[in-house]
Amino acid sequence: MLIFVIIKVNFMIKAVVFDLDNTLIDFMRMKNTAVEAATKAMIDAGLDFPYKEIRSKIDAIYNEKGIEYQQVFDQLLNHFIGRIDYKILSAGIVAYRTAREAELNTYPQVIPTLVKLIKMGIKLGVVSDAPSKEAWLRLTYIGLHHMFDGIVTYDDSRERKPSPVPFNLILDKLGVKAEDAIMVGDWAERDVVGAKSVGMKTAFAKYGDTFDTKVHGADYEINSVAELVEIVKKENKP
């Protein structure tokens, strides 16, 4: 007589991996405020062009070069006056940095949620398309640099999401299998698609969505990072 035994395999959430900008940090609010301050400061310092025209050119440069482009004001000045005026440039840089530091904050409940997850024995990671220097500066400035077991930036993987490379790299750093980890991010086409491609569970951070995403394809949708605690408890329920 043959006896068939059905074994049910329960995967548990052992790690939570976060995108950085617009998931842990309200990046776009900070960026917009800093660029606005820099634009006004450069006008006050002698850049005699309309605010809207200058701001439009800054946005165009970021769209072409990437949001982390560090020479944006240099390129802006070359465009408008054909040279680098260091009085104007320094005014823009100082205003940008001052506003950035004032506005660089986590979303509500980020730190308490991370602490709760740590106390639950959950490993924490970050996968970001930002350069290492910029990612670590942001994490350190808001006091999150010591809370993660692994961090992967563009400089680590040399590939941007949704490539599977950065996701596999963070899984290796955390020492967990894909099915035992959940990815949290605001950009469905990058965070959700990339994580699902390697077998991770996913949570769409609707609170940080800047694209008015209608269909995200994630396993969960969250309006606050605090919801992750109950999601992990649910996934790990026997």
Residue ranges with predicted function:
Residues 3-16, 28-29, 79, 111, ...:
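Asp-based, Mg2+/Mn2+-dependent phosphohydrolase catalytic module
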Residues 11-112, 133:
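N-terminal helical cap/lid subdomain that shapes the substrate entry/recognition surface
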